[in-house]
Amino acid sequence: GTAKLEKGSAAPKVVVTLNKGGERVLNAKNVMLAVGARARALPQIGLEADGDKIWAYRDALAPKKLPKTFVVIGSGAIGIEFASFYRALGAEVTVVEAIDRIMPVEDEEVSKTAQKGFEKRGIKFKTGAKVTKVTKTANGVSVAIEVGGKAETLEAEVCISAVGITANTDGIGLEALGVELDRGHIKTDSHCQTNVKGLYA
């Protein structure tokens, strides 16, 4: 079934809507949330994984086919790992990154050195690039980007979305309880307790 939090007497109660119909209410002194995460989607530009032409990280881990060309959007750990992996398998790979260097959380010197190494292996990079539209085509995907004010279009069989991870916190009742979130992630103290008594994450 699916679960939702509601206000309880001591701690929030968990209301489970059963697959076969009906509900089950669980009361406890403490409730631990372990909701997991999923790949972030950007539907406003057409970047939503479908497992076919637009892949999230899970699709890229267990592909149904081995495409010859890829556009990877995002050059953090996930994007770079898949770009490197599929290039090693012989695919042509272009990585698109919004800021002016790859691997943005790494030291700038590390980013520059890594990019040179990846380029020697044949990976292409478009840095400082804004993705404006991802469109599915008969042969794959078309990725429209802007680099330095100039529009470009990249074509590939598959686009890998590596634009981040988001917590599975939608629709589980956090807002109604007043649970504090930070960009969708549950805020906790040093004991993993949220701002709601008896609710941990």
Language model features with spans:
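A conserved short coil-to-beta-strand element within the FAD-binding core of flavoproteins
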Residues: 1-13, 40, 127-140
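Glycine/serine-rich phosphate-binding loop and adjoining beta1-alpha1 elements at the start
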Residues: 6-13, 17-53
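Core beta-strand elements of the Rossmann-like FAD/NAD(P) dinucleotide-binding domain
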Residues: 20-30, 149-158, 195
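Short glycine-/small-residue-rich Rossmann-like dinucleotide-binding loops
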Residues: 36-37, 147, 160, 164-165
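Glycine/Thr-rich phosphate-binding loops of Rossmann-like dinucleotide-binding domains
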Residues: 41-43, 80-81, 86, 168-171
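FAD-site-proximal beta/loop scaffold in flavoenzymes
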Residues: 48-66, 153-201
